[in-house]
Amino acid sequence: MVFGEFFHRPGQDEELVNLNVGGFKQSVDQSTLLRFPHTRLGKLLTCHSEEAILELCDDYSVADKEYYFDRNPSLFRYVLNFYYTGKLHVMEELCVFSFCQEIEYWGINELFIDSCCSNRYQERKEENHEKDWDQKSHDVSTDSSFEESSLFEKELEKFDTLRFGQLRKKIWIRMENPAYCLSAKLIAISSLSVVLASIVAMCVHSMSEFQNEDGEVDDPVLEGVEIACIAWFTGELAVRLAAAPCQKKFWKNPLNIIDFVSIIPFYATLAVDTKEEESEDIENMGKVVQILRLMRIFRILKLARHSVGLRSLGATLRHSYHEVGLLLLFLSVGISIFSVLIYSVEKDDHTSSLTSIPICWWWATISMTTVGYGDTHPVTLAGKLIASTCIICGILVVALPITIIFNKFSKYYQKQKDIDVDQCSEDAPEKCHELPYFNIRDIYAQRMHTFITSLSSVGIVVSDPDSTDASSIEDNEDICNTTSLENCTAK
């Protein structure tokens, strides 16, 4: 019995309300229920028709004036105690989620939970929310992995209706799945090596040995490396495009767009260099050429095709725009506040480099992100105190959303690994067709046929299993040995 029920004794003039909750019957005073008119039982007493009553309870007996509720009777004892005492108490053995649903059904607010149980209730509720979030994230990751795997299977099925479907299928799998076979791994390693060689050549080309007053010097070796890399990139993109099962989906893939963007600067620069004009636009074209050459750095994004981590990072940033927005908002507020504070205490000092609020913006940015280049710094005591506060606030502000983003990155990284494993497991049956096939049953049948034929050739007939004696068994063994020896000699 819950505390509060034992001490309550209704008066003789008070009208009782008969309640039946899952077989637990209790008669309660109307005045007790009307203390909380916004709850379900309080609203029940204000109903003027049977239809309105049945909207609040599961059944109603007119003869007995009994209201029936198909709810948990053990939890209703705590609800009933609330009407007597005005406070909710949560026992240690109760399920927080079930208790929350129960009081929500009866229309009781969580604010009525007594202070002795409120902290424990909120802590356990937050723990359940965190577990649910982790489970939902894992389920979403698993479901999306299965969805992408099923899409991969559908893409493979499209090749059956295409021209040169089998050839295009083999090429497409080897280009898209480096773990498929040895040739696919060699293609992936070659593509990765070409990307790195192109980036190294671009960086070496910017060194002072390859510069003069007029601009860059065309080194034949670096130019040859550049042409070879572009030829590889162009051929790779053309092969992918030719083998793709759907051209429209091909151009919707971000990795394919990156491949296309990485080769545009070379051909655009080549077109600008071959154009002969004797006007003032030549100088502008030279600037365009320099910009296009700098765009070659986008080739490094091609590494995402061969890196699970880079693909996971892109998916994390794409699905964490809310957390990234919060991070930028926190930093913006902190930068605005501390830049004005540092400017107000440093502006009167002639030795300070913080002479304007825009400069203070830069100082606050590198301070809150704990970079601290040292090009601008406060010189007064008040400025140093503000700088210390700025750095501490920056550490706290940056750390809050980063944890959530890191957890999402872990989930998406595991998701990408699951997708790769699923694709490898789906490709395994196709690899098995290339291996030699042996059927043990057929081999056994062939051996038995050879054995019976050898018995027939020497005139031995087995008529009755019970008539077999030791001498016949020895003869059979000699025949078997002779037959196996002849088979080995024939082989």
Curated annotation (Swiss-Prot):
Q: Which GO terms describe its molecular function?
A: delayed rectifier potassium channel activity; potassium channel regulator activity
State what this protein does. Answer: Potassium channel regulatory subunit that modulates the delayed rectifier potassium channel activity of KCNB1 by namely slowing down the deactivation and inactivation time constants. While it does not form functional channel on its own, it can form functional heterotetrameric channels with KCNB1.
The entry sums up its family as follows:
Belongs to the potassium channel family. S (TC 1.A.1.2) subfamily. Kv9.3/KCNS3 sub-subfamily.
Q: Where in the cell is it found?
A: Cell membrane
| Complexes and interactors | Heterotetramer with KCNB1. Does not form homomultimers.
What is the recorded membrane topology of this protein? Answer: Multi-pass membrane protein
SUPFAM superfamilies per record: POZ domain (SSF54695), Voltage-gated potassium channels (SSF81324)
Domain comment, in the record's words?
Answer: The transmembrane segment S4 functions as a voltage-sensor and is characterized by a series of positively charged amino acids at every third position. Channel opening and closing is effected by a conformation change that affects the position and orientation of the voltage-sensor paddle formed by S3 and S4 within the membrane. A transmembrane electric field that is positive inside would push the positively charged S4 segment outwards, thereby opening the pore, while a field that is negative inside would pull the S4 segment inwards and close the pore.
Q: Which domain of life is it from?
A: Eukaryota
Topological domains annotated Cytoplasmic: 1-182, 244-254, 307-321, 414-491
Q: Which PANTHER family does the UniProt record give?
A: POTASSIUM VOLTAGE-GATED CHANNEL SUBFAMILY S MEMBER 3, VOLTAGE-GATED POTASSIUM CHANNEL
> Is Iron-sulfur a UniProt keyword of this protein?
no
Please list the intramembrane regions: 358-369, 370-377
Q: In which tissues is it expressed?
A: Detected in whole normal term placental and placental chorionic plate arteries and veins. Detected in syncytiotrophoblast and in blood vessel endothelium within intermediate villi and chorionic plate (at protein level). Detected in most tissues, but not in peripheral blood lymphocytes. The highest levels of expression are in lung.
- Extracellular face residues: 205-220, 276-285, 344-357, 378-384
- Motif annotated as Selectivity filter, chain positions: 370-375
Against Gene3D superfamilies, the record matches this protein to: 1.10.287.70, Potassium Channel Kv1.1, Chain A (3.30.710.10), Voltage-gated potassium channels. Chain C (1.20.120.350)
**Keyword terms:** Cell membrane, Ion channel, Ion transport, Membrane, Potassium, Potassium channel, Potassium transport, Transmembrane, Transmembrane helix, Transport, Voltage-gated channel
What is the name of this protein? Delayed-rectifier potassium channel regulatory subunit KCNS3
Membrane-spanning intervals of the chain: 183-204, 221-243, 255-275, 286-306, 322-343, 385-413
Q: What InterPro entries does the database record attribute to this sequence?
A: BTB/POZ_dom (IPR000210), Ion_trans_dom (IPR005821), K_chnl_volt-dep_Kv (IPR003968), K_chnl_volt-dep_Kv5/Kv9 (IPR003971), SKP1/BTB/POZ_sf (IPR011333), T1-type_BTB (IPR003131), VG_K_chnl (IPR028325), Volt_channel_dom_sf (IPR027359)
In its UniProt record, which GO terms are filed under biological process?
action potential; potassium ion transmembrane transport; potassium ion transport; protein homooligomerization; regulation of potassium ion transmembrane transport
Single GO cellular component term: plasma membrane
